């Protein structure tokens, strides 16, 4: 895919995305069977963009799709990883660190 095709695709995506909030809203029933609207681009704590300080609603940046955070994705599967630092043990590392801090 060349640059021109990619640019056309980007322009089409921008034209299709728009700022129409009615398309990005869904109705969801709560425990009390009350309907309320939520924006599909706001996933709150479930969003990969969620941060309690700078993005508490978990809103995706412009031109990015918001997806659910899956904690299983970031779990190491397999044998445990043992850190090897050029065959240095803790004693040798502390000596090297103390020499560099002088």
UniProtKB/Swiss-Prot annotation:
Its main location: cytoplasm. It is found in: Cytoplasm. It holds the Pfam family NpwBP. Residues 1-38 are annotated as: Disordered. It comes from Vanderwaltozyma polyspora (strain ATCC 22028 / DSM 70294 / BCRC 21397 / CBS 2163 / NBRC 10782 / NRRL Y-8283 / UCD 57-17). Transmembrane segments: none annotated. Belongs to the AIM4 family. The gene is AIM4. Keywords: Cytoplasm. This is Altered inheritance of mitochondria protein 4. One of its GO terms (cellular component) is cytoplasm.
């Amino acid at each position: 895919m060349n640059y021109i095709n990619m640019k056309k695709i980007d322009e089409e995506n921008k034209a299709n995305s728009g700022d129409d909030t009615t398309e990005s809203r869904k109705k969801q029933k709560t425990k009390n069977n009350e309907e309320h609207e939520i924006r599909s681009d706001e996933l709150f704590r479930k969003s990969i963009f969620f941060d309690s300080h700078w993005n508490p609603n978990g809103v995706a940046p412009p031109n990015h799709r918001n997806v659910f955070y899956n904690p299983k994705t970031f779990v190491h599967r397999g044998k445990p990883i043992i850190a090897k630092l050029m065959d240095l043990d803790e004693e040798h590392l502390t000596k090297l660190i103390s020499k560099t801090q002088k």
